[in-house]
UniProtKB/Swiss-Prot annotation:
One of its GO terms (cellular component) is cytosol. Keywords: Carbohydrate metabolism, Cytoplasm, Hydrolase, Magnesium, Metal-binding. GO terms for biological process: fructose 1,6-bisphosphate metabolic process; fructose 6-phosphate metabolic process; fructose metabolic process; gluconeogenesis; sucrose biosynthetic process. Mg(2+) 1 binds at residues 90, 112, 114. The gene is fbp. Belongs to the FBPase class 1 family. This is Fructose-1,6-bisphosphatase class 1. Its EC number is 3.1.3.11. It is found in: Cytoplasm. It comes from Aromatoleum aromaticum (strain DSM 19018 / LMG 30748 / EbN1). The lineage of its organism: Bacteria, Pseudomonadati, Pseudomonadota, Betaproteobacteria, Rhodocyclales. Binds 2 magnesium ions per subunit. The keyword Magnesium applies. Substrate binds at residues 115-118, 207, 273. GO terms for molecular function: fructose 1,6-bisphosphate 1-phosphatase activity; magnesium ion binding. Its cofactor is Mg(2+).
Length: 333
């Protein structure tokens, strides 16, 4: 059986008119950065890469050493390619401008360089999430406003999962496709064509320690799941929670389920916990392209109009029937 690499896959997408040459090359640069991040993640304590960096990110969260390293890898890899007008990182407050002596392109790249980094020191899977938007026409100098586009305007989205194997999951608006890093070849190999989220599920992912802070619709929904076979749902459900969005969403993508980080009293003033531009939008695009659904509980995530670069939102995504049920409970109040 012929092994198809990420490069070959993207060339075929370009030939079919689904991606532009610059978008293809941009995704390849991101993939090379992912390989470099994977090497650093795998070294861990051997290279003194565990623990905190002694700095805080824009959200006031303590940065891990690998947060800083992954962020720098992505910035440096993508600066010089000529495909980008600017970048935005979850770890950095301001828009990252392309150096003046490098060529500029027609795309904007947003990323969470190392999602789930609180798990690094205990050797649990972490990941990278990225999103690609078009740079609006008629603007000379990129600024924050250029990035404030609803998620439905994304031209590509993906994530890398650094686990027992390194996976790159990608959509360019033509389904969801998975690639596994062959470390001997040094290439991502096409291993998961047209991934789909099962419509029904018996698994859910939520941080149950926040139950007392949830809004009534979420409390009602989770209570029904916990009642299992003897409750209104008539079947047993299992709860899974990794505290790494990439790992939790990947499980939903591969075997079905629902992932929830809902609005609660702890994060109400912030508008939610997860970042719209760096986490919610790309994951929502991936899940919808795989046949699932993604909402805030009140609105389709991809229709949310961003007001600021580091905006937070509630996230409920996964198998369509479950997401629709939770959303209906929110409508009922």
């Amino acid at each position: 059986m012929r092994r198809v690499t990420l490069t070959q896959f993207l060339i075929e997408q370009q030939r079919a008119g689904r991606t532009s040459p610059d978008l293809r090359l941009l995704i390849e640069v991101v993939a090379r950065a992912v390989k470099a991040i994977a090497v650093n993640v795998s070294k861990g304590a051997l290279a003194d890469l565990l623990g905190e960096a002694g700095t805080d990110n824009v959200q006031g969260e303590a940065q891990k050493k690998l947060d800083v390293i992954a962020n720098e890898i992505l910035l440096q890899a993508n600066e010089w390619g000529g495909h980008l007008a600017a970048m935005a990182s979850e770890e950095v407050e301001e828009v990252h401008q392309i150096p003046f002596d490098y060529p500029k392109g027609g795309y904007l790249l947003l990323f969470d360089p190392l999602d789930g980094s609180s798990n690094i020191d205990v050797n649990i899977s972490v990941g990278t999430i990225f999103s690609v938007l078009r740079f609006p026409e008629g603007i000379q100098e990129p600024n924050e406003q250029c990035f404030l586009q609803p998620g439905r305007e994304q031209v590509a989205a993906g994530y890398a999962l650094y686990g027992p194997s390194t996976l790159l999951i990608l959509t360019v608006g033509n389904g969801v496709h998975g690639f596994t890093l062959d470390r001997e070849m040094g290439s991502f190999v096409y291993t998961h064509p047209f991934m789909t989220v099962p419509v029904d599920t018996q698994e859910y992912a939520i941080n149950a320690s926040n139950a007392r802070h949830w809004e009534p619709p979420v409390q009602r929904y989770v209570a029904e799941l916990q009642q299992g076979r003897t409750g209104p749902r008539g079947k047993d459900f299992n709860m899974r929670w990794v505290a790494s969005m990439v790992a939790d969403v990947h499980r939903v993508l591969t075997r079905g389920g629902i992932f929830m980080y809902p609005l609660d009293e702890k994060c109400r003033d912030q508008g939610g916990k997860l970042r719209l531009m760096y986490e919610a939008n790309p994951m929502a695009m991936i899940v919808e392209q795989a046949g699932g659904s993604a909402t805030t509980g009140r609105q389709r995530i991809l229709d949310v109009q961003p007001a600021k670069l580091h905006q937070r939102v509630p996230v409920i995504l996964g198998s369509t029937h479950e997401v629709e049920r939770v959303t209906a409970y929110h409508r009922e109040g």
